[in-house]
Curated annotation (Swiss-Prot):
InterPro entries from the UniProt entry: ASFV_fam_110 (IPR004848)
UniProt organism field: African swine fever virus (isolate Pig/Kenya/KEN-50/1950)
One Pfam family, short name: v110
Function: Plays a role in virus cell tropism, and may be required for efficient virus replication in macrophages.
Keywords associated with the record: Glycoprotein, Signal
The keyword Signal is annotated on this UniProt entry: yes
Protein name as catalogued: Protein MGF 110-7L
Sites carrying sugar chains: N69, N70, N105
Signal sequence segment: 1-20
Family the UniProt entry places it in: Belongs to the asfivirus MGF 110 family.
Signal keyword on record: yes
Source superkingdom: Viruses
């Protein structure tokens, strides 16, 4: 009888955990990836916006994959980082290229951007050129 009661309590507890973790904007498990699902980009890029998968870069100018042409374009520099993301239950984790880890509760996300100082907005008349070595003139 005690085993049955404990089993029922365990079942109720686990169903409560499942419903609370799936009520987040992203749900289920996501194995470590450099390329999160397209429908989750808005979530992942809102909280760590310097991840490379958040940006489309061409000729040194990057545009947000989430906000597109309605956002400010930025210069491709050390602000843009390779990130891997994963999710296990209610734990969302970023692994940034220098093996810096940021973990947050998926249901209570907090923005994190230590690279913001490197962000440089692109100005329309700004041109990029490769730094030439002396013998490349």
């Amino acid at each position: 009888m005690l085993v049955i009661i404990l089993g029922v309590i365990g079942l109720l507890a686990s169903s409560n955990l499942v419903s609370s973790s799936t009520s987040t904007r992203v749900g289920g498990h996501l194995p470590l990836t450099f390329d999160p699902p397209e429908n989750e980009l808005g979530y992942w890029c809102t909280y760590v916006e310097s991840c490379r998968f958040c940006w489309d870069c061409e000729d040194g100018v990057c545009t947000s994959r989430i906000w597109g042409n309605n956002s400010t374009s930025i210069v491709e520099n050390s602000y843009i980082k390779y990130c891997e993301v994963s999710r296990w239950g209610d734990q969302c984790r970023y692994d940034v290229e220098e093996h810096i880890y940021y973990t947050m509760n998926c249901s209570d996300p907090k923005p994190w951007n230590p690279y913001k100082i490197a962000r440089k907005e692109w100005k329309k008349n700004e041109h990029f050129r490769k730094d030439l070595k002396k013998d490349e003139f």
